[in-house]
């Protein structure tokens, strides 16, 4: 199966730091896939809050996550701090990509 490639924007409009806790670690002693999604969800909440929104109210609409994709660049371990950067793109009548 070919690896996915996510085209990243040249510039991100938001950045946040999240600590990797012991409950984020799997049996391989590094960040678990499901924990990554949880951390990205927390970053999304922070991003929306920085713009004055919540997941339940972005200009009167609630957020629905329809797709999730990850392209791993390195492992993450307990005690490290992950920097998650976000930008919004591909706006359409159904939403956008974050």
Where are these regions (language model features)?
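Hot-dog-fold acyl-thioester-processing enzymes
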Residues: 2-67
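Hydrophobic beta-strand-centered segment that forms part of the acyl-chain substrate-binding groove
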Residues: 47-97
């Amino acid at each position: 199966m070919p690896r996915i490639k996510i085209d990243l924007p040249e510039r991100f409009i938001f950045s946040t730091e999240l600590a990797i806790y012991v409950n984020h670690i799997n049996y391989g002693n590094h960040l678990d896939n499901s924990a990554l999604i949880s951390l990205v969800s927390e970053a999304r909440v922070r991003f929306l809050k920085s713009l004055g929104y919540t997941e339940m109210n972005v200009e009167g609409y609630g957020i629905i996550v329809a797709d999730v994709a990850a392209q791993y660049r390195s492992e993450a371990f307990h005690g490290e701090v992950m920097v998650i950067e976000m930008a919004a793109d591909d706006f359409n009548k159904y939403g956008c990509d974050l």
